[in-house]
Amino acid sequence: EQTIESIATAGYTSILCIVTSPFYSMIGTGAYERKLHSILRAYPDISCEIIKSWWNRPQFFEYWRSQLMAANPLQADTACIFSAHSVPTSTVGSYEDEVMSASNQIAKMVGLNHWYQAWQSAAPYGEWLGPTIESVIEQALIDGAKRIVCIPLGFVSDHVEILYDNDIICRNI
């Protein structure tokens, strides 16, 4: 609210909003969008454009391709696990398809024939999109993986919970 007030005070009449999640979800991006529109009702002179998703941009794919290639993912004993934020199954919409499509495209760019999809940060209540990254790592180890590469493509900025999950919890599995 303070940011919008500052924008109005400075005399701006147009804003462009980009959510740091590359994938649109009703519970994530949609919640920010609803909150913003609610605040903007008090500022009728400000127009707003929201970029709801941007996962399908070439730069997004190229970034993840280069990051993944740096991890040498094609070794026989390596399991590659793509992950994104989990959402309640009742609000999935196109979110799961977008994430799966991005994971598949990046895997093809790198030459992965087999990879896993996982979901992180589900709330402890209700039904959320799964499987969890922990259960996928366990499955990859059962399948013979000696090395795990996590590709958190749903998280494009440092996210304390995901850093903890991937750097501490997942390492101890």
Locations of regions flagged by a protein language model:
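Extended amphipathic ligand-handling, pore-lining, and cofactor/metal-binding catalytic surfaces
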Residues: 1-173
